[in-house]
Amino acid sequence: MSHEYQIPNLVLDETDKQILTILHEEGRISYTDLGKRVDLSRVAVQARINQLIEAGVIEKFTAVINPAKIGIHVSVFFNVEVEPQFLEEVALKLEEEPAVTSLYHMTGPSKLHMHGIFTNDQEMEEFLTKRLYPLRGVVSVDCQMLIKRYKSRMGMKL
């Protein structure tokens, strides 16, 4: 019998959902302006947001940067097959790589699904040959380069 503490699911009311929806689209909105939109005081909005942060519902506030505007022109999705006994080791090494923007363990034969961004093709090739292929346990790598982005959403939308 496990005695590990489980955090209960937080029940969000409609006002919390409204606040989260607005913050998802307008993360820099002031508490005052947000309060006007959800019919609460600035102090009440701030208290609710702090509760959502403390409960782990809001993980962080961040800016979404357009990679092309800062010289990053190559966006690649990778499926990395790894020998099962090395999966955790490979994942821990890849999560430290600056080019890796997301990394997931997927269903299938020990698959890691990864997204990476690079300034050019040569940088991507160097990542593959010097950083990814040499990792112990990597069996195969499948890459798909992004041609055009139609939709990209950060975080979860309610």
UniProtKB/Swiss-Prot annotation:
Keywords: DNA-binding, Transcription, Transcription regulation. Pfam families: AsnC_trans_reg, HTH_24. The keyword Transport does not apply. One of its GO terms (molecular function) is sequence-specific DNA binding. It comes from the Bacteria. Gene3D superfamilies: 3.30.70.920, Winged helix-like DNA-binding domain superfamily/Winged helix DNA-binding domain (1.10.10.10). One of its GO terms (biological process) is response to amino acid. Residues 12-73 form the HTH asnC-type domain. SMART domains: HTH_ASNC (SM00344). InterPro entries: ArsR-like_HTH (IPR011991), AsnC-type_HTH_dom (IPR000485), Dimeric_a/b-barrel (IPR011008), Tscrpt_reg_AsnC-like (IPR019888), Tscrpt_reg_AsnC/Lrp_C (IPR019887), WH-like_DNA-bd_sf (IPR036388), WH_DNA-bd_sf (IPR036390). Residues 31-50 bind DNA. One of its GO terms (cellular component) is cytosol. This is Uncharacterized HTH-type transcriptional regulator YwrC.
